[in-house]
From Swiss-Prot:
GO terms for molecular function: DNA binding; RNA endonuclease activity. Belongs to the PemK/MazF family. Induction: Mildy induced (5 to 9-fold) by oxidative and nitrosative stress, starvation, growth in the presence of isoniazid or gentamycin, strongly induced (24-fold) when grown in a non-replicating state. This is Endoribonuclease MazF9. Its EC number is 3.1.-.-. Toxic component of a type II toxin-antitoxin (TA) system. Upon expression in E.coli and M.smegmatis inhibits cell growth and colony formation. Its toxic effect is neutralized by coexpression with cognate antitoxin MazE9. Acts as an mRNA interferase, specifically cleaving between U and C in UAC sequences. May cleave its cognate antitoxin's gene. In E.coli expression with non-cognate antitoxins VapB27 and VapB40 partially neutralizes the toxin. Forms a complex with cognate antitoxin MazE9. InterPro entries: PemK-like (IPR003477), Plasmid_toxin/cell-grow_inhib (IPR011067).
Amino acid sequence: MMRRGEIWQVDLDPARGSEANNQRPAVVVSNDRANATATRLGRGVITVVPVTSNIAKVYPFQVLLSATTTGLQVDCKAQAEQIRSIATERLLRPIGRVSAAELAQLDEALKLHLDLWS
């Protein structure tokens, strides 16, 4: 079962316009109850944040992820502005997981991008 905070290799093709595409890492951000249901049923959708190795500029709605702690091959950033739901069939293999601090930063980036401040 995939868990919140895990990084998975996913297949985002076909994509349109400026959507993240190709096979790439993504951080699972859907809650573990939804993830467990999708696993149990063998179908359904989970929510992920795509990751890119282009870290020349990291915006406030993006989170830098260290290769040394995540299982990624190089330092990357999670792109909260690219959040999306994907079919579980798009999950290819687990890579690693973000730290608790990185997941908290990603939660803040998602709040900023989605304007969920309370």
